[in-house]
Regions:
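Short strand-connecting beta-turns/loops that link adjacent beta-strands
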Residues: 13, 43-45, 75, 99-102
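Hydrophobic pocket/interface hotspot
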Residues: 16-21, 27, 50, 70, ...
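Beta-strand/loop substructures that line and gate deep hydrophobic ligand-binding cavities in soluble
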Residues: 82-133
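Glycine-rich portal/gate segments that line the openings of hydrophobic small-molecule binding cavities
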Residues: 39-83, 138-144, 150
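Hydrophobic/aromatic beta-strand elements that line small-molecule binding cavities or substrate pockets
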Residues: 6-8, 37-39, 65-71, 90-98
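Intrinsic-disorder/low-complexity, polar/charged segments enriched in Ser/Thr/Lys/Arg/Asp/Glu/Gln
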Residues: 1-7, 47-49, 65, 77, ...
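Short amphipathic alpha-helical signal-transduction/dimerization elements
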Residues: 25, 128, 132-147
């Protein structure tokens, strides 16, 4: 198991950033080389279940799919649970808050890999922060450019 905490300072509105983050149908825009397909399986007021087809491009080049449940705990807090696949049982918590006119995005990862894929732990530890930073930076740029009603 790998547990990681990351914090990112983003130059955008918290509300607009969170709106983009929870616009699941458009997530592939921020992960064009990785997220090949995203299908919403079940949608409710406070949670959404999605299935993604992902292509990993690190040491191994492999496509896989996973289902995940994304629960909106509050207006600034998401909880993600991976329901199947090699990382079944992994949890990610994403929370945002405004601080000095910046959005602070805190991410807590609790990653559980199957025995077959445990060799990926060092890669995940090494690559995760920069991967998230790239995604969140793209989202914050779009949030900053978004219209006020967004």
């Amino acid at each position: 198991m790998v547990t990681m905490d990351c914090s990112f300072e983003l130059d955008c509105s918290e509300k607009k950033f969170f709106k983009i983050l929870t616009d699941y149908e458009n997530l592939s825009k921020y992960l064009p080389r990785h997220l090949q397909k995203l299908e919403i399986l079940d949608e409710h007021d406070n949670y959404t279940t999605i299935k993604t087809a992902v292509f990993a491009r690190s040491l191994i080049k492999k496509a896989f799919s996973q289902e995940m449940k994304i629960e909106k705990k509050s207006e600034n807090n998401l909880s993600v649970e991976l329901l199947d696949g090699f990382a079944k049982g992994s949890h990610v918590t994403i929370s945002t808050q405004m601080q000095k006119e910046k959005t602070i995005c805190d991410v807590n990862l609790d990653i559980k890999l199957s025995l077959k894929t445990a060799i990926l732990y060092p890669i995940i530890k090494r690559e995760c922060r920069s991967f998230l930073l790239r995604i969140f930076t793209k989202m914050s740029i779009d949030a900053k450019q978004a219209k006020e009603e967004f």
